[in-house]
């Protein structure tokens, strides 16, 4: 039976049935199916349908991986964006529709979290983008005040020894509003308060300050993580704390002490694993991952990575904590497998099965850039 015949058969079904079938499909075929009829196009472009389709995709298997700014060596051409289906041995290059093909425009960092299939690309000296890798939809982000200040400081910025914190990206769980957030330490760059917080507002297409900002300085190296409608950072205190920013009320609070103290910023990471806030400390020869129970405010040990074993891929000298990316379905196994990578070598993604204590390569290349997991969706921001 030809594709045309199958589409004609689908059109003869009640449209409610057609919708139920369509929402179980991936984003790529749905983009093509918009050409079948005006009714199909209207359905597929409906925000309600897109939410249901995204929920189905989340429940149907593992996420894909977006690899940002891959570069094999200093003389190689940078590949701005490539996407990988886990289990595949090759990745697919994604065109960047917002820029001319200029080398300097291909290098970005990426928010540690995706949100409804959207990711946030950023750089400390140039405009960023909220981007949907599946549909190629994007929204440019103008320079925030921090970026403008760093540009004004110029080359003197490097003499300050200032560590620029990473951009956070999340969603207000009550209103569904998406918010890029830049929280940064202020004193080194001539600002008065301990920290400054800027939030991007899509309704005005502008950044605005949040006041009061965070009461504690933050550790600049680990990226912020969004869990359950709040962004989280490590505080720069003798006793490391977890600082939370509620994306609805836009207020800060300390939610817990970390399960470790007096640590170097390169030895700790924060991540979202199955919608749970997790933190991890590298303490050679292991790296323990802790999961936070928001109900009783306690931490429990989720698993431990043996860095002696991973040194075969990551090198004998581990200078910073590896970064967990996602928990993968273990099929019949009770516990899911952990996907993680080395932030220094950026060549290999490894899967750890905590039940069997095994380690396997999920993907390997000369460069994997900055990887972030996402579920492909049709969602955009109007």
UniProtKB/Swiss-Prot annotation:
SMART domains: FBOX (SM00256). LRR repeats lie at residues 78-101, 239-262. InterPro entries: F-box-assoc_dom_typ1, F-box-assoc_interact_dom, F-box-like_dom_sf, F-box_dom, Gal_Oxase/kelch_b-propeller, Kelch-typ_b-propeller, SCF_F-box_component. Keywords: Kelch repeat, Leucine-rich repeat, Repeat. It comes from the Eukaryota. Residues 7-52 form the F-box domain. PROSITE patterns: FBOX. Transmembrane segments: none annotated. Kelch repeats lie at residues 180-227, 270-319. The keyword Hydrolase does not apply. Pfam families: F-box, FBA_1. The keyword Repeat applies. PANTHER family: BNACNNG10540D PROTEIN, F-BOX PROTEIN CPR30-LIKE. This is F-box/LRR-repeat/kelch-repeat protein At1g09650. It comes from Arabidopsis thaliana (Mouse-ear cress).
